[in-house]
Amino acid sequence: MVIQTSDYLQHNGIVKGKLTKSYYTLFRPENGNIKATLLILHGMQEHSGRYMEFAQYLAEQGLAVITYDHLGHGRTAKNTEELGFFQISNPAQQVVNDAENIADYLEKRYSDVPHFLLGHSMGSFIARCLLQQAGSRFNGAIIVGTGGKVPGAKLGKAVSALLNKIAPRHRSRFINTFFNKQNNLRFKNEPNESGTNWLSVDKNNRQAFLQDELCGVLFSINGFYTLLSVNVKATDRRWAKTLPQAFPMLFISGSDDPIGNFGKGIKQTVSDLEQDGFKDITMKLYTGMRHEILNETDKQNVYNDIINWIEKHL
């Protein structure tokens, strides 16, 4: 059995005197026998509730798992107008700080067990930034659905930084549509399910995403500025230089995931780490799976691989 509790955790804001708060859910085994913790960072235009089944499974295996909604997402957003908008001043640093604050909460609550980090998609880039900032908090990291350098990302960051000062809350349907269209290029011969084909092979998962009012909300200019900022920092050639070379990392992705350039991005990331002397890097591409490998038809295989990797590193 799993005990599940939800609440809000307050953070100090980057803007002096301003506080932020995150909606989180903690999953833990009812018997109290906890062998490790896991902090999960979700992706863009979704929310932590989509990881409930995965978190419950891990809690049944003896982990204390915490999921939470980033700024501008899920129940952390104060209202629907806040969805897709983070904050005007240094939003990328704020989301990384929020993640560290959640990690600190989990670490203090379960101080005598190993702590692990998992980030998916945008959450994978936030996770990589968090490892730069506070890698010593963790005993290992699972990077899901990540990518390498994106051509034009630095230019996009510069342009969006300027637009963030002019019209941060503006939601460009063109930019949002372009983003989805690029991700769907490989699948253009399939019947288009409102631009969600790239997310997964599982059509039920696509429909669940489309029917979830907290998913797929148009990102604001500020949202894309935040996304590009964490992406550029996370994909720097020496992004992991603050981590010890023995730090264990598991990189997993679908072979048909456009965010990882269909395996090329994750392979390059792992190759760079190995060239830099990292000794405990594991990579697995799941044949035929797309972006959301935690929500695919064969997701149980992914779940099993993750728990086996964690148990190997206890």
What residue ranges belong to the model's regions?
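Alpha/beta-hydrolase active-site loop
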Residues: Q87-E107
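Short beta-strand element of the alpha/beta-hydrolase
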Residues: I34-G43
